[in-house]
Amino acid sequence: MKFSKPKFSMPKWRLTKEDFTPKGMWRNFKNFIVIEAKPGTTLAERFLTNEDLYPVPKSQRVWGPWNYVAFWLADSVNVNTWMIAGTAVESGLSWWEAWITVWVGYTIAAFILTIAGRAGAVYHISFPVLSRSSFGIWGSLWPILNRAVMACVWYGVQAWIGGECVTLMIRSIWPSFSHIPNTMAKSGTETYQWVGFFIFWLISNVAIWFPVYQIRHLFTAKSFLAPPAAIAFLIWALVKAHGAGDAIHAKTQLSTWNHGWAVTAGIISCLDNFATLIVNNPDFTRFATTPNAPIFPQLITIPMGFGITTLIGVLVGSASKSIYGENIWNPLDLLKSFLDHSNHHGVRAGVFFISTGLCLAQLGVNIAANTVSAGNDTSALCPMFINIRRGGYIASIIGICMCPWNLLSSSNSFANSLSAYAVFLSSFAGILIADYFVIRKGYLKVDALYTINPNEPYWFTYGINLRAFASYICGLLINVVGLAGAVGDKVPKAALTMNNIAYLLGIVTSFLSHLIICKIFPVTACGEKFLDERPEETDNYLLTLESTEDTISSYEETEGIPVKKVSYDSKEKSDDGKSGGIDIKESSVF
């Protein structure tokens, strides 16, 4: 099954006078915004499916183990990860204790992420489609909506951070750039900062255009450029400070009780950092060449890559105190200080190189964690009108409209709110993992995930699995008081203490609750033993998509409306020379 490369093509009509009437213009507009559907798809099914939601065809399963190594190695280098260990040091831990907590945290995160993405690698389906098996055909819209909202918010935040990288790049070339007149004072930002943000936003829009299975090349490029930039930053800071500074020699002064909770908070912060990636990991594992391709790259590369990045962050932050008298954990703030204190061409060249690497790092993180997720999620919310590409651009527009500089101006409350929101995502993750691994034992009826039929196993109660929502509420209730405290309300101290492990409480509680509820009220379509071989469900379902018409590649008039159709050809072969099933020839759509 082979998709052709996407192209931008406008429907070609022979214009008549009627096309310029209100009725004609409305008809043409509707034809443009409606996503093409497989011939024979009913109107009801069009609210469940489009080409981006179907299982990935064989020709697009091109992510091998080394692609996942490059992906996670590239993703590990970003501004947020850089500062995690520094935050733990600020809480009172020694540098090596902070680093160990990071290794432990990301090892746990890698394990949870790997099992959460298993269904995507086996059945080649995305998170929104997988959610239908647990929450029901219509019930899945709730976790999808939650994930989509988070993706849009985080897109704007990460884009603003990427814009700061662009600003540093421009400042290193034209030092006077930061002194241009501020015409945006009332908006809460500086003109030069907004220009950097807008440039990064435009660059991101170019990356959004490409289909997901092709953007692996972006992460490969990032894996070769971003880590060397981080290492160069480390060497530069150590040389400039004549060592790593005093922070690495400091010992913890915390009591045993506070020391234990500081370690715990450091571990959980890593899980919070991965909350979104854990849930939407099937969006990437679905492109795996084999079900096992992502396993070891994720289990090994994530703790190693993220651990090394945080180590660099701690050493650079410690060195900054010897240079400027204070620990500067944010790498962008330290680069700004370099430019503020020196106009030497060597300093400017170094800042430009490092800022370019960090800019590429932020671009990759934003595409992986937010754009792809928002595209998949919004596509599932309204598949008749939105595909992954359009969904990505929707997130991009929301990201700039939400004025992320205003959110970050009150950084503490905003960061606490986003961290608290990880509780919602942890409950979703616990249910998805319990449902797939324990209850269904790895078996999914793929065709039923795309069907509105009361007789199918994922219809449950009018399309909603009440068991999953009961489990979801259990996962929230155990954290609801601590959640209120995290956003500023007065709550008992015990609740605040529990909030330090909110993610683990949420995922474990929802996991166990779902097992118990489904034991009392069993679901159908479950395996008798765990599926330990590659199922034929996905490929068999793809074969059923073959139309009775062998080739449909042009616009045809249906009741006077031009309708775009998709052609199917079962004779194409995949890249490895084996039969690739159906060939969907996409005359693609924006």
Swiss-Prot record:
Membrane topology of this protein: Multi-pass membrane protein
Stretches for region Disordered: 566-590
Keyword RNA-binding attributed: no
Chief subcellular location: cytoplasm
Residue ranges annotated as Cytoplasmic topological domain: 1-68, 116-124, 171-194, 240-258, 320-390, 440-467, 522-590
GO cellular component: cytoplasm; nucleus; plasma membrane
Alphabetic keyword roster: Cytoplasm, Membrane, Nucleus, Transmembrane, Transmembrane helix
Topology, Extracellular side: 90-94, 146-149, 216-218, 280-298, 412-418, 489-500
Gene Ontology biological-process entries: nucleobase transport; uracil import across plasma membrane
InterPro entries: NCS1, Pur-cyt_permease, Uracil/uridine/allantoin_perm
Presence of keyword Cytoplasm: yes
Bilayer-spanning residue ranges: 69-89, 95-115, 125-145, 150-170, 195-215, 219-239, 259-279, 299-319, 391-411, 419-439, 468-488, 501-521
Matching Pfam families: Transp_cyt_pur
CDD domains reported for this sequence: SLC-NCS1sbd_NRT1-like
Subcellular compartments: Cytoplasm; Nucleus; Membrane
UniProt GO molecular function: nucleobase transmembrane transporter activity; uracil:monoatomic cation symporter activity
Family per record: Belongs to the purine-cytosine permease (2.A.39) family.
Name of protein: Uncharacterized permease C29B12.14c
Species this protein is from: Schizosaccharomyces pombe (strain 972 / ATCC 24843) (Fission yeast)
